[in-house]
A protein has these predicted regions:
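A short glycine-rich beta-strand->turn/loop micro-motif centered on a GG-aromatic cluster
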Residues: 109-112, 131-145
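Short, aromatic/basic amphipathic alpha-helical patches
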Residues: 147-159
């Protein structure tokens, strides 16, 4: 439903390497500081290229149906959260902000995983990177933990994101602009 509201579609997804420096085997060891500058927390294996977890979620368009694609976290040294930069320090652009500017985007609608890390960081990067409105579709997001998800919603809203419940609410919002 969200894709039908867009003139252009962007796909971003993790594409991790089996030798990533931030990997841990046990979920109990997840989300602990790594001491690394471009991979701040430990994570269990996810979105490893060539695995089921690397694929797009059921119901999403195929990769070739998107207008712009970002694969992030390919380098085993880097574990970025946002879709706009390949690194946590936000020095290595993925080109997404530049592409959106070239397309004269005025509104960006965001949904994805995980609300409290990748979605939040992407939304904050988009808000800093352009003059467009950033709308977040809550129904199209899932997070890691309820406490950090709630904090992420508040942080995105405080930064200027328009957080709406679902695609129906987004359509209503857009039609009233």
């Amino acid at each position: 439903a969200q894709a039908a509201l867009a003139d252009l579609r962007v796909m971003t997804k993790d594409a991790h390497h089996a030798a990533a420096k931030w990997l841990v085997d046990n979920p109990v060891d997840m989300l602990k500081p790594t001491g690394l500058s471009d991979a701040d927390l430990t994570w269990v294996s996810h979105a490893m290229v060539g695995t089921y977890g690397y694929g797009l979620l059921d119901g999403l368009p195929s990769t070739k149906e998107y207008d712009y694609c970002v694969w992030k976290g390919i380098d085993p040294e880097l574990h970025p959260y946002g879709a706009c930069f390949h690194d946590i320090e936000e020095k290595l652009s993925t080109g997404l902000i530049e592409w959106l500017r070239c397309q004269n985007a005025d509104t960006v609608i965001v949904g994805g995983l995980a609300t409290d890390y990748c979605v939040k960081t992407t939304v904050l990067q988009l808000l800093k990177g352009g003059a467009w409105k950033v709308i977040v579709n809550q129904a199209a997001c899932r997070g890691i933990a309820p406490e950090t998800v709630e904090s992420a919603w508040q942080e995105m809203h405080s930064a200027g994101a328009i957080v709406l419940e679902n695609a129906k609410e987004i359509k209503k919002y857009i039609n009233n602009q």
